[in-house]
Amino acid sequence: MESLFTGRIGLVIHLAALLSSAGEQHPDLAWRINADATWNLMRQAMSHAEAHGHTVRFVYPSSIAVHGRNASQSHPLLEDEAIAPRTLYGVTKRAMEQAGTWLSEECGRMLGQETGAAFDFRTIRYPGLLSAETLPTGGTSDYAPEMVHAAVRGEKASCFVPPHAQLPFMTMPEAAEATLALASAPRSCLQQNVYAVGGFAPTVAELENALRDRFPNFEVDYDPHPFRSEIVDSWPADVDDSAAQRDWGFQRGLDLGSALDDYLIPGIRNAHSQSKYECEETPRTL
């Protein structure tokens, strides 16, 4: 891991993780990737800051999975409300939020006193993410992108949560933009280390109806998985991102309709047509 820190590194964005459902199936691997590797990377970043006498900003993407029990309340949740993760993924995300904050506030301050260096830790807590280019695997919020991709491809969707289930979502480009905005914000503007961001928060039934408005023949086969449904029910139906708006100018962008019409549907169609073209153009070998 030391080889990652060559030259003078000022910003680390640590995206690697084993997601919620996959983490429940492979807990030891989830801990090694989500906790041990993250801790080691943070320590290396701090050592790099000390060695070069400058500040390293460490941006850590976290998740609504840190919330739990009674999180599905009628009001959008603040960052410190209903923290009781139901999954090991959520446990590791919360642990690293706290570990990074500790390093930033305690060890980082010690480095600064001695060398002028600092470890500047920032967390962006994502909702569910929707990508037009790839289908996610191993996440509990996967039902939404699976439904969208199936509708665009003219396929019947299978949904592992009931119609009333509800989670907040944002598109992948919006998540990337928000991450870079937090990364570039002056430290003096940040009043906390952990920031929630949100987008739109449809129920599964609302997502199904929006897709059927655009694809009249779209069908969904509901086959709720008890454990995955339980996880979704433990997460917030929406989040309060007023702190991100206040401190670094975050603004919610697309609603469900515009996310479908302006990004997801055309993007999935384009990716699907390219994939089909590549398959047709690939020469067959015997």
Each language-model region and where it sits:
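NAD(P)H-binding glycine-rich loop region in Rossmannoid oxidoreductase-like domains
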Residues: 1-33
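Hydrophobic positions on the long internal alpha-helix
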Residues: 37, 41-45, 99-100, 178, ...
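A conserved pocket-lining segment of Rossmann-fold NAD(P)-dependent short-chain dehydrogenase/reductase
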Residues: 23-24, 82, 125-138, 146-170
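C-terminal substrate-binding subdomain of Rossmann-fold SDR/epimerase-dehydratase oxidoreductases
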Residues: 155, 160-162, 168-286
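Active-site Tyr-X1-5-Lys
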Residues: 47, 71-72, 84-122, 152
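Glycine-rich NAD(P)-binding loop of the Rossmann-fold in SDR/ketoreductase-type enzymes
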Residues: 11, 25, 29-40, 83, ...
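The catalytic Tyr-centered alpha-helix of NAD(P)H-dependent dehydrogenases
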Residues: 74, 81, 85-92, 136, ...
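Conserved Rossmann-fold NAD(P)-dependent oxidoreductase catalytic core, especially the SDR/UDP-sugar
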Residues: 12-14, 39-88
